[in-house]
Amino acid sequence: MLASLIGGIFGTKNERELKRMRKIVDQINALEPTISALSDADLSAKTPEFKERYNKGESLDKLLPEAFAVCREAAKRVMGMRHYDVQLIGGITLHEGKIAEMRTGEGKTLMGTLACYLNALSGQGVHVITVNDYLAQRDAELNRPLFEFLGLSIGIIYSMQSPTEKAEAYQADITYGTNNEFGFDYLRDNMVFSLQEKKQRGLNYAIIDEVDSILIDEARTPLIISGQSEDSSQLYAAINSIPPKLQPQKEEKVADGGHFWIDEKQRSVEMTEIGFETVEQELIQMGLLAEGESLYSATNLNLVHHVTAAIRAHFLYHRDVHYIIHNGEVIIVDEHTGRTMPGRRWSEGLHQAVEAKESLEIQPENQTLATTTFQNYFRLYKKLSGMTGTADTEAAEMKEIYGLDVVIIPTHRPMVRQDQNDLIYLNRNGKYDAIVKEIKNIQETRAPILVGTATIEASEILSHKLTQAGIRHEVLNAKQHEREADIIAQAGSPDSVTIATNMAGRGTDIILGGNWKAKLAKIENPTLEDEERLKAEWERDHETVLSAGGLHIIGSERHESRRIDNQLRGRAGRQGDPGVSRFYLSLEDDLMRIFAGDRVVGMMRAMGLKEDEAIEHKMVSRSIENAQRKVEARNFDIRKNLLKYDDVNNEQRKIIYSQRDEILAEHTLQDYIEEMHHEVMVGLIANFIPPESIHDQWDIEGLENALRVDLGIEVPVQQWLDEDRRLDEEALVQRITDEVLARYHARREQMGEESAAMLERHFMLNSLDRHWKDHLAAMDYLRQGIHLRGYAQKNPEQEYKKEAFNLFVNMLGVIKSDVVTDLSRIHVPTPEELAELEAQQQQQAEAMRLSFEHDEVDGLTGAVTHHEVEEQPIVSSDHIVPPSSRNAPCPCGSGLKYKQCHGRL
């Protein structure tokens, strides 16, 4: 109330921002007559002039009015499009490192060219980030003529691109690509063996298209490059026979003979006592568990992992909802966009369990080699901005996590779409029948209809019902993504009915009357007559659709995010066009079933509604919106929590990657190696000669043996002490270090500077990468169990920081020890051996392909692409010796029962 009163007096923050930017727009418009008078050559020559002025110290802010005026004039001449004033405001917003919320169809792609052009003048590169390869390619090719006219180069990055092409794309003034590809290139750049292999030239400025999808929906998605671990395919296949014999328990706290309880919110399962006993018996019969042995003993934790994955695969992940089968592979379906994600795989053995369930070939599990999150990757950019049709509902999160303000850009023409109230039915069948009936009614007006569904399953049920009703229609879901552009291009034609799974991120406008240019492109060698005919047909169809009320949007289910619902609605009413939208819901919808209050559901059931009857009530609509707010708040908390923990990992990641860059950049690493020798010697000697100890406590024999075994060097420590009794601890350390270094220098001289430097670089990078990989696994295990510290009255976050720091320090010590040991024990290599070593490094670098993991916290779903780099067992967590009963207190000291703590699945 108070906020709205103050806003009414002083104007909202958004209104004040728009008022300030309109003054800059006035400056741009004032330059238009002068810029329009320039010849093409003079207009193109403005770019080198701006670059020179920038290099002499003029800021981009100062150049903005003139640069925007030049870009607008160039777009007018090259593309036949002139930026509206609202697009200029959007361009200013992007340049200032903010998020521009612009309605669908208002020209976000054209708006982005302004900020791209201005920021490319710095010569440091601009990255334009999209949600898929199709949009990156489309936008780059659409804008290429404009930027090339202005003297700027364009690059496109994509997966499986040759190293040369990718390097050239990153050297371009403006580079287009997907968020995944940019993120993976960053990780890959920090796994190379020479600076020349790096592709990215720094993270200067990024414009993220569909910014809410990338920074919100995929924020808790770690990017992971991984390698194969041990093969457990036979075990997955064997355990797959167990879940069909089990029954879920209906409620968590009410024992009803069920074997496990399902938590749909967390997408996790917890075994009951009966479940444990049943599974144990099954495993004993299979010969996987010895008679009298317990499933929850420390040695059988691997079996627990497999059983859990199998139950989740059978009861929580369903075909044509969470995944599809294509060419004998399980392909994940993105829950936010409805797109398939080829190559991505769920983690924690879930993907293998689904493959076993579907009787497909089971691929091996993976181990993490390098990882970051989108949250931390995008915060590395010096300046970040974004554009979307829907960001205002997540404005607080954008500000808190990324420091990005959201500016709502006014529409060029007033929005006249009618958003009608939701209709709620008793069950899904009644809802689907009502949708079919409504489609029949709308078809009488010849208006185009877009039906949005949340799952592939729902789209196919509706498609079946429409077919039975004799209604012609198109289906756009993960199974038809190859025809996506064609389907969307004609979705605005009269009489068209299109069923689409989650329109979020589709990135293509639906033009009322259809897209005559798309039809023309399909004609081989089109003539001018063809063009005129198609234009005339479109004008006739366009008028038909306008008179029918525009595009009609039917939502078959509310998404858990209001923003996704708004994106579906936003497909209608573009640029002042008419349109209608309405959502059809049922009590069986996941959002209603899981999150809506029992009181609302009970009240609706008590009303005695029939299957074909609907209610339309503000209280129910409010309840649905509150449910969505709860889910959004919960997901925000998860993302914030992920960031808290990943910030710890991120600081360590920065140190490791910085150290890697130093190793690659230095011509010689001799100083580093000598320093390492000294540190390692101090640590090694301290194991046998404790600091500030007396001679009687010294283990000289053990020290000499360690030097012989670890470093391959004979050091007569006892002889030195016999010869000089005054030799103290400090002097002894120095003398041993000098002896080891003398041997190192002699070998170095024998190899020659170039060969020695290459060998040192190889050992340092190899040790760093190997132990960093193991450290990531150890950090994963630490994170999975750190919440248990809360039961011991400790702060899990602080405990995580402390433990992570100790792990990191230990890792650095082990890396140094490894390098010194390897360099001490290796024989002087021949030129042929050095050449072979270099070839191996090249093969390893070329073998690195991206893999991608969704590994969401708290058991939420995730995906990982597996790529075999080398076979390595995953570091195991500390074992907890189980008590005699699962109801006994857990030995970890948490105060919980064992079954609710370390014995929990």
Swiss-Prot record:
Residues binding ATP: 87, 105-109, 509
Subcellular location(s) of the protein: Cell inner membrane; Cytoplasm
Entry membrane topology: Peripheral membrane protein
Primary localisation category: membrane
Binding, Zn(2+): 890, 892, 901-902
InterPro entries: Helicase_ATP-bd, Helicase_C-like, P-loop_NTPase, SEC_C_motif, SecA, SecA_CS, SecA_DEAD, SecA_motor_DEAD
Cofactor note: May bind 1 zinc ion per subunit.
Self-association and partners: Monomer and homodimer. Part of the essential Sec protein translocation apparatus which comprises SecA, SecYEG and auxiliary proteins SecDF-YajC and YidC.
Record's protein name: Protein translocase subunit SecA
Organism: Acinetobacter baylyi (strain ATCC 33305 / BD413 / ADP1)
